[in-house]
Amino acid sequence: MDLAPTSPQAQARALTVLGLESSCDETAAAILRREVDGSVTVLADRVLGQNDAHAPFGGVVPEIAARAHAEAMDGLVSQALAEAGLAVADLDGIAATSGPGLIGGVMAALMTAKGLALGAGKPLIAVNHLEGHALSPRISEPLAFPYLLLLVSGGHTQLLIAEGVGVYHRLGSTMDDAAGEAFDKTAKVMGLGFPGGPALERCAQSGDATRFALPVPLKGKPGCDFSFAGLKTAARQIWDGLDAPSDQDRADLSACVQAAIARALSSRTRRALAMFVDRFPDASRPMALVVAGGVAANKAVRAALEDEAAAAGFRLVAPPMKWCTDNAAMIALVGLEKLARGQIDGLDAPARARWPLDGAAAKSDPAIGSGRKGPKA
């Protein structure tokens, strides 16, 4: 991909950034290099998952995750540097997820980055994890601003307009649970294993997506907000009402839940596509609908969104599967973008459990995306 030079300093020399990620249950380190002509190369990309540690509990246990991040991070950094053939002294900056996420996990990447930056005298770039997902397709292909972004994962479901690095306008957000939460919790109820989303998708392959009637969240309601709590509850009630459920019952309910989530995402995205066209009538065609985050790896969701995009004259853009879930390559990319603009942070940069991607969300009253736990990132 190419990053357009943004300053004389950015054009003068190549930049190499180490990115670190530990916001949930993947520990990751990656190194990206930006050449003078704007092209970007992934020099190293390491990810260590924690599925085996969390599987007995059916979900991510924050304390276990934080401990695993702390134990793994130094080794992954060493592996990434060795893979790239570099030393810390060769880097131009250290980027790390600073939030949002599980605070104990976030601190593992951020504190490691601070130590490296201080010891080597390198700039620190504190990265919003959500911006990493927002820009992740740009790791592998040119993607011009503005574009419509559907950010969909286990913790977030948002529709935003991406107008530039650090410039985002939210059109809608979940009012309760994220789409990935509905996937994961339904999978847990049916005993499909962890992680739940991919397990449910595999189970759905042999299921009948028309067998069970599930509600379409916010059907007919204006706006671009989402709601998945009711769908999650309805799926559980259907499961609890089955007498000695069979493997086929599991497959059918998995297929129905997957189809309902895909319909909900595509119907709200349809509204956002129209709003994007109204806002940018002169944008170059075809315009881009970007889907990013862990749920972007779901093939049924991608297919539904591809249909919506094509009907509206957009092209669907998604990162490669390996960069849909949490990774450090996207963190390093944001680090490159910000470093090229001279946007660096002090060693007092905080770890944040919540950090809205769009500044207006944190100031709105009531907060955009408010739910049972308050303003969501």
From Swiss-Prot:
Write the Enzyme Commission number(s) for this entry.
Answer: 2.3.1.234
Annotated keywords: Acyltransferase, Cytoplasm, Iron, Metal-binding, Transferase, tRNA processing
| Example GO BP | tRNA threonylcarbamoyladenosine modification
Which top-level enzyme class is recorded in the Swiss-Prot or TrEMBL entry? transferase
Q: Where does Fe cation bind?
A: H129, H133, D326
Which segments carry the region annotation Disordered? Answer: 358-377
Q: Which domain of life is it from?
A: Bacteria
**Keyword Phosphoprotein found:** no
- CDD domains according to UniProt: ASKHA_NBD_TsaD_bac
Q: Give the protein's cofactors.
A: Fe(2+)
Query: How many cofactor units bind, and how?
Result: Binds 1 Fe(2+) ion per subunit.
Q: Which GO terms describe its cellular component?
A: cytoplasm
Q: Where in the cell is it found?
A: Cytoplasm
Chief place where the protein resides: cytoplasm
Isomerase in keyword set: no
Record: residues binding substrate: L151, V152, S153, G154, G155, D184, G197, N298
* One Gene Ontology molecular-function label: N(6)-L-threonylcarbamoyladenine synthase activity
What is the reaction catalyzed?
L-threonylcarbamoyladenylate + adenosine(37) in tRNA = N(6)-L-threonylcarbamoyladenosine(37) in tRNA + AMP + H(+)
Classification via HAMAP family? TsaD
The Swiss-Prot or TrEMBL record describes its family as follows: Belongs to the KAE1 / TsaD family.
**Role of this protein:** Required for the formation of a threonylcarbamoyl group on adenosine at position 37 (t(6)A37) in tRNAs that read codons beginning with adenine. Is involved in the transfer of the threonylcarbamoyl moiety of threonylcarbamoyl-AMP (TC-AMP) to the N6 group of A37, together with TsaE and TsaB. TsaD likely plays a direct catalytic role in this reaction.
Write down what this protein is called: tRNA N6-adenosine threonylcarbamoyltransferase
Native species of this protein? Maricaulis maris (strain MCS10) (Caulobacter maris)
